């Protein structure tokens, strides 16, 4: 049953995903975010930028980006100076939590049109040096993005998140072979989808003023995801089997630096470091209908869950049921699940724990959407 306050997806866009220090390395997170916002607003057809009432953008590595990165991106995209903007830092689920924030504003009747999404430039994340106590520099990607600051009963604060993935392997009995097979299949699907043009509608080609490796020359237009284009066809199971385990005891866990005898998580079964941004335009059903905006999907429910950070890997199995309850749906009603592949073990663990079917990419924050012509 429809409602005037239904949260409808009326526009979407994303940049290509650039590899670490790759094609988009010369562009800041703010520049990438503004491109995604412009593309999303343009995809709505008749929507004027002045109609956007609020912006929520996920952004984790904000050190050195200046005040209010979300506002910077919104203004650079041509939105009004009167638009309130908020940055969300929830690590891997920052962008999806931004979607939830925007959806709740619409559902509460506070807003009719919001822009939501996320942006990141891991290539531009700076090094950090303590003001006192020595001048040793720490990369902010490692400190702010890849290290557990809270710890738990088994992993100390400062542990690499990859050790939590290894812990999940221990507790769930997931072996190296299963993770390599999952990673290989993920690369295969990404490569096949790219070749079939499945991402063409959502990617807004990004123009880099000049190659990031030189100080002048012609502009370069980036049209596709760099990691998939460079490695997708070659990242086979045989190649993945050659990689060494990436995480060792002593990676901040209080150990002695001794390598795990049976480490399973590798760079191939972990997420890449990358640059890019994505955005959605959300609108109330009433506003979308009155202004002839295309309704691409309806957000029916959301769910958040948390547990000890060393067990972040299985939090989606708690968030998914919460989202389904909020949407008054059951798992039998769901045609597609997406699970965040921070590590292959996350998808494998939650596929079994939540009794899900085919899984590709669910973050710790989950949304249930109705997508397609049926509104």
Please identify what each model-predicted range represents.
Residues 89-120, 169-199, 279-286, 375:
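Active-site-proximal alpha-helical scaffold in enzymes
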Residues 39-53, 168, 172-173, 288-295, ...:
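Phosphate/pyrophosphate-binding loops at sites that engage ATP/ADP/AMP, CoA/4′-phosphopantetheine
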Residues 14-41, 61-63, 86-100, 112, ...:
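Active-site pocket-shaping loop/turn-to-helix segments
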Residues 49-58, 84-89, 114-119, 178-185, ...:
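Beta-strand segments within the central parallel beta-sheet cores of soluble alpha/beta enzyme folds
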Residues 27, 59-113, 155-163, 234-272, ...:
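Conserved catalytic cysteine-centered active-site region
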Residues 164-166, 202-204, 300-358, 370-375:
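Active-site pocket-lining segment
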Residues 8, 13-15, 26, 30-35, ...:
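N-terminal extracellular/periplasmic Venus flytrap/periplasmic-binding protein-like
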Residues 113-168:
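Flexible glycine-/small-residue-enriched beta->alpha junction loops
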């Amino acid at each position: 049953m429809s409602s005037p306050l239904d949260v409808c997806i009326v526009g979407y866009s994303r940049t290509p995903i650039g590899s670490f220090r790759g094609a988009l390395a010369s562009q800041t997170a703010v520049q990438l975010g503004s491109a995604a916002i412009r593309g999303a607003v343009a995809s709505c057809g008749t929507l004027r930028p002045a109609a956007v009432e609020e912006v929520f953008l996920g952004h984790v590595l904000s050190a050195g980006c200046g005040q209010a990165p979300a506002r910077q991106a919104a203004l650079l995209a041509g939105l009004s100076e009167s638009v309130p903007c908020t940055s969300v830092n929830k690590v891997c689920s920052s962008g999806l939590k931004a979607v939830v924030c925007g959806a709740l504003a619409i559902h509460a009747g506070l807003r009719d049109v919001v822009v939501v999404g996320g942006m990141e430039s891991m290539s531009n994340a700076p090094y950090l040096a303590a003001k006192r106590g020595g001048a040793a520099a720490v990369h902010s990607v490692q400190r702010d993005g890849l290290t557990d600051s809270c710890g738990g009963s088994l992993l100390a604060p400062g542990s690499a998140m990859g050790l939590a993935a290894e812990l999940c392997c221990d507790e769930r009995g997931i072996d190296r072979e299963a993770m390599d097979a999952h990673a290989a299949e993920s690369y295969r699907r990404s490569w096949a989808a790219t070749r079939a043009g499945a991402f063409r509608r959502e990617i807004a080609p990004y123009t880099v003023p000049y190659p990031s490796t030189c100080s002048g020359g012609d502009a370069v237009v980036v049209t596709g995801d760099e990691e998939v284009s460079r490695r997708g066809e070659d990242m086979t199971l045989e190649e993945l089997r050659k990689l060494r385990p990436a995480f060792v005891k002593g990676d901040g866990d209080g150990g002695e630096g001794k390598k795990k005898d049976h480490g399973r998580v590798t760079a191939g079964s972990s997420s890449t470091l990358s640059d890019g941004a994505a955005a959605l335009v959300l609108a109330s059903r009433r506003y979308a209908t009155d202004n002839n905006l295309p309704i691409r999907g309806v957000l029916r429910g959301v769910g958040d869950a948390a547990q000890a950070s060393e067990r972040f890997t299985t939090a989606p199995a708690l968030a998914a049921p919460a989202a389904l309850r909020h949407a008054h749906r059951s798992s039998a009603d769901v045609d597609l699940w997406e699970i965040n592949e921070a590590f292959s073990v996350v998808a494998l663990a939650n596929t079994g724990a939540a009794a899900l079917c085919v899984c590709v990419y669910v973050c710790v924050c989950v949304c249930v959407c109705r997508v397609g012509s049926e509104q």
